[in-house]
Amino acid sequence: VLSTAAVAGTEYEILMETYAGHYYPESPDGGCATGPVLPGSYQDPLEEGRRRTLGVCTFGIWNEDAYQLWMDADTLKQVLDKLDPNSLRAAKIAEALENFTLAVDFEQDEAGRIASYRAGREALKPALEAKNGSTTPVFYAVGNAHIDLAWLWPMAETHRKTERTFAAQLRLLEEYPEYKYIQSQPAAYEMCRKYYPELFQRIKEAVKDGKWIAEGAMWVEPDTNMASGEALIRQLLYGKKYYKEEFGVDSQMLWLPDTFGYTAALPQILKSCGVKYLVTQKIFWSYNEGEQFPYHYFYWEGMDGSKITSFLPTSYTYRTDPSELIGVWENRSQKRDLDAFLLPFG
């Protein structure tokens, strides 16, 4: 959004940075391309057939009233679709949505439309303000960005991708004071510090203000099966040192959403390095037709008896709309001893 209070005649200069596509083509079955891009294997510009083209650019006039009305109505419609149609809540939401359709008139002039949008929101307000009961689960939602440091693009693009992601999140933290964002990988932070020092200073301020959560314990988000115990300890040594020196944070949580495996030595290694918690989730994605993992919240006991408190969401790319949240809860593996759920979205 260029402006939420634009004045007629104002001119804007737009600078656009784009990435023209991955070096590797899509797989024959249409799935994700393979990687990573090895040093020296990347041709810039890409040869014909592997080059993407920006073909269409559009713009529109932002109407905050219309957007908020759409959000309200869509939220209630998604909730309604998931409810027992015989429930009182379903009846109340259906009534509110009907009243909304009677209040809104899209055929009026601009002033009339805006007035009707606001009347429509008032019609939906009672249903949106209804309180949940005492047996409703709690979701702890936090923004995150899982940045692959080396996958389908050259390292130079990782630098730019990191900068774009961090800058966008800082803007969101300013726009939404209640928003919290978590970011792992000191390796990514170090790229930012080296190539975008002013941006890095803004991140440090956001960490100090409690808006940006600098956590993760390890230097990167590594595989834990191929790496030796010494390599994993080094990950923790350098990772925790960086968090402490740059952000004043004693990192106590291993944030490992996208690893492909877990060594049985991990609880012992984490405990010995002062890490108390583990968050991961790929076990729900890559089970190769095996039996579904039965828990989300549990103690993982290592070979030496060390215990790590662990929480496994089923994704790190959740949406935050009602249908997603209700679906996450209904499809959870652990049906008992669980009344709250971590929801990393982004």
Over which residues does each language-model region extend?
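Catalytic-domain carbohydrate-binding cleft regions of carbohydrate-active enzymes
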Residues: 1, 7-346
